[in-house]
Amino acid sequence: MKHIVKHIHFVGIGGAGMSGIAEVLVNLGYQVSGSDLARNAVTERLEALGARVSIGHDAANIEGANAVVVSTAVRSDNPEVLAARRLRVPIVPRAVMLAELMRLKQGIAIAGTHGKTTTTSLVASVLAAGGLDPTFVIGGRLTSAGANARLGTGDFIVAEADESDASFLNLYPVIEVITNIDADHMDTYGHDFARLKQAFIEFTQRLPFYGSAVVCIDDPNVRQIVPLISKPVVRYGFAADAQVRAENVEARDGRMHFTVLREGREPLPVVLNLPGLHNVQNALAAIAIATDLDVADTAIQQALAEFNGVGRRFQRYGEMPAAGGGAYTLIDDYGHHPVEMAATIAAARGAFPGRRLVLAFQPHRYTRTRDCFDDFVNVLSTVDALVLTEVYAAGEAPISTANGDALSRALRAAGKVEPVFVATVDEVPDALAKLARAGDVVITMGAGSIGGVPGKLAQDTQQKG
């Protein structure tokens, strides 16, 4: 590609999916520019690496670019997209650019409705501990690397494969992971769950004859498609027919302790520095891949025991002062689908048994809130206290029957928790100050702007201290 394309421009360069690819391309020696609506830590990092970042979208920003990269979040009437069309500069979907990177190395693509970011991070960490020095592109900040992407010298690139817009079908990896299949982003698939499952089957058809599909056999929808996968399959999970299986699972001190059974191998005792059964499954995917690539068991154990997590995935902010004295534990999580939320709540209950659980939740997208309305009511009813904000629209038009007020009314009718409704995220800190008590576990949760709340709480605490 480099003999033709020298300068690559990213529209929305500060986004989690775009910034990682941009960083790898900078490190490969490409001239990279980009634009976004606001400056953040990610754009500042890219600028420090040599990328040119413009704040605001303007046709002039793409000057000199040989290609313009866009995600599905970028509107077709964006001035930079219109300028690229007018100048006949190729407009490249994000997934297609990721596919180009995968052509340079052997790709390991992590797919599934939930758990992609954590699983991708675990795979990258285990391979790095095994000396394979992988390139990785992750949808969240890997704490140990201080970034969501890195150009390694090894043969492998580990990346998330996004099913939300079916763009994962652009990828041709040599190893694939399918963590689970659940009803989300159903607009892409015409609200037809069979079409969604078929897309995952087609994803496995991108594998070469020597490739493998590493699948979580605990998930009933994944189990249904396994007979339809024509390439070699490695099953992981808790089920009896898993080829990489966890047993003797125990939660202790915020960590998961378990033993891994693999065909033809000695039992492997593992301590995972993450809470929750869902994270044990994510770790099993990494163990399955590492075993296949002959990573030493000691390296696997070390990487999982020392795993420092990913930004906004059960990210611990420490102890915050409660208004009545004492302190509460603050955690932030990206969960925005009822299944993910239930897993995080269960992990918190396991990590902090007997403690009161307070959740501040910002729903993400009106369509998701509409499609999963009853499931949201059910999962939100399992916490001890709740702050609920208006829906983060993510560009969608409001739906009056699926907004924050409608969800609040349904929760009150269910009668298990009394939600404190706030119209904006800016009101969350004050609401939590009134609600949180000493000894509580407080989780801020959602895929929208609520991600800025825990940092503000921590900063305010630091300034007062």
From Swiss-Prot:
- Uppermost EC category: ligase
Which terms does the record give in the GO molecular function aspect?
ATP binding; UDP-N-acetylmuramate-L-alanine ligase activity
The principal localisation class reads: cytoplasm
The answer to whether keyword Transferase applies is no
Which pathway does the protein contribute to? Cell wall biogenesis; peptidoglycan biosynthesis
Q: Which GO terms describe its biological process?
A: cell division; cell wall organization; peptidoglycan biosynthetic process; regulation of cell shape
The reaction(s) catalysed by this protein are:
UDP-N-acetyl-alpha-D-muramate + L-alanine + ATP = UDP-N-acetyl-alpha-D-muramoyl-L-alanine + ADP + phosphate + H(+)
Residue positions binding ATP: G112, T113, H114, G115, K116, T117, T118
A Pfam family in this protein?
Answer: Mur_ligase
Keyword annotations for this protein, in alphabetical order, are: ATP-binding, Cell cycle, Cell division, Cell shape, Cell wall biogenesis/degradation, Cytoplasm, Ligase, Nucleotide-binding, Peptidoglycan synthesis
- Family matches, as InterPro entries: Mur-like_cat_sf (IPR036565), Mur_ligase_C (IPR004101), Mur_ligase_C_dom_sf (IPR036615), Mur_ligase_cen (IPR013221), Mur_ligase_N (IPR000713), MurCDEF_pg_biosynth (IPR050061), UDP-N-AcMur_Ala_ligase_MurC (IPR005758)
Identify the EC number(s): 6.3.2.8
Q: May I have one GO cellular component term?
A: cytoplasm
> Where does the record say this protein resides?
Cytoplasm
**What is the stated purpose of this protein?**
Cell wall formation.
Q: What PANTHER family would the database entry show? A: UDP-N-ACETYLMURAMATE--L-ALANINE LIGASE, UDP-N-ACETYLMURAMATE--L-ALANINE LIGASE-RELATED
For this chain, the family text in UniProt reads: Belongs to the MurCDEF family.
- Output this protein's name: UDP-N-acetylmuramate--L-alanine ligase
Write the lineage as a comma-separated list: Bacteria, Pseudomonadati, Pseudomonadota, Betaproteobacteria, Burkholderiales
